[in-house]
Amino acid sequence: MSLKNKFKNFFSLDDEEYEYEYIETDREEIPEEHESKDRTAYQSKAAGKQNVVSLQSVQKSSKVVLSEPRVYAEAQEIADHIKNRRAVVVNLQRIQHDQAKRIVDFLSGTVYALGGDIQRIGADIFLCTPENVDVSGTISELIEEEHQRW
């Protein structure tokens, strides 16, 4: 082969040598009956998955914070605990009555805004709970009965 033919073959394509053959194959069609069974099975599996609850969405542990404020400024810290979805037991026995009333008013507004609840559970002791905590039962009736016995 001459040098001229080598260059010609190198830079140009010879149509006869590089012709591709296309073979068309018919795809096998799936019968509709089989396809509908697969869809039904998939849909039932998908429906079953809707009943599964993610464990990550469940809170690992609930916390209850005990607080004994000595000044009104500590009410903000208590409100922050409630905002962070923690229940708080507030003991107001070591603070003046007018300051205690202001704290209860502030915490009442906080739990109302957050959809929570505030309950008196003893003499100058309150339980503030966020919306994710349910409290059942009452102990204030028992306290009143004890005072009547003495």
UniProtKB/Swiss-Prot annotation:
The UniProt record lists the keyword Cell division: yes
UniProt keyword terms in alphabetical order: Cell cycle, Cell division, Cytoplasm, Septation
Main location: cytoplasm
Region (Disordered): 26-45
Gene Ontology CC annotation, any one: cytoplasm
UniProt cross-references to Pfam families, sorted A to Z: SepF (PF04472)
Gene3D superfamilies per the UniProt record, alphabetical: SepF-like protein
BP terms from Gene Ontology: division septum assembly; FtsZ-dependent cytokinesis
Protein localization: Cytoplasm
Domain of life: Bacteria
InterPro entries linked: Cell_div_SepF (IPR023052), Cell_div_SepF/SepF-rel (IPR007561), SepF-like_sf (IPR038594)
Similarity comment: family membership: Belongs to the SepF family.
HAMAP family: SepF
Function summary: Cell division protein that is part of the divisome complex and is recruited early to the Z-ring. Probably stimulates Z-ring formation, perhaps through the cross-linking of FtsZ protofilaments. Its function overlaps with FtsA.
Subunit description: Homodimer. Interacts with FtsZ.
Name assigned to this protein: Cell division protein SepF
